[in-house]
UniProtKB/Swiss-Prot annotation:
Might take part in the signal recognition particle (SRP) pathway. This is inferred from the conservation of its genetic proximity to ftsY/ffh. May be a regulatory protein. This is UPF0122 protein SSP1533. InterPro entries: RNA_pol_sigma_r3/r4-like, UPF0122, UPF0122_fam_protein, WH-like_DNA-bd_sf. SUPFAM superfamilies: Sigma3 and sigma4 domains of RNA polymerase sigma factors. Belongs to the UPF0122 family. The lineage of its organism: Bacteria, Bacillati, Bacillota, Bacilli, Bacillales. It holds the Pfam family UPF0122. PANTHER family: UPF0122 PROTEIN CBO2450/CLC_2298, UPF0122 PROTEIN YLXM. HAMAP family: UPF0122.
Amino acid sequence: MSQNDLIKTIRMNYLFDFYQALLTKKQRNYLELFYLQDYSLSEIANTFDVSRQAVYDNIRRTGDLVEDYEEKLGLYRNFEQRQNLYEQIKQHINDPEQIKKYIQALEDLD
């Protein structure tokens, strides 16, 4: 697995966590098996008795859909920003002025 594939898989796992409630059961099943359980297209196709192409198309369309949700709702983007601010707070724990700045930035995200 290349570095880009790994980054995409991690991103899709996060997007799946945030947006799975907005997906159909079939979409959830395919994405979960492919990205979280690391099933191959053939294994998913055999499990659901469909073609590999059908699985591929569904995963691609569903991936595009969760990316669209992220573009509109930004749940993952906000999560990443919060995580970065938490790390900054940890690094500046002995600097009250910096802490206030980061807390304000956290509040501004809401």
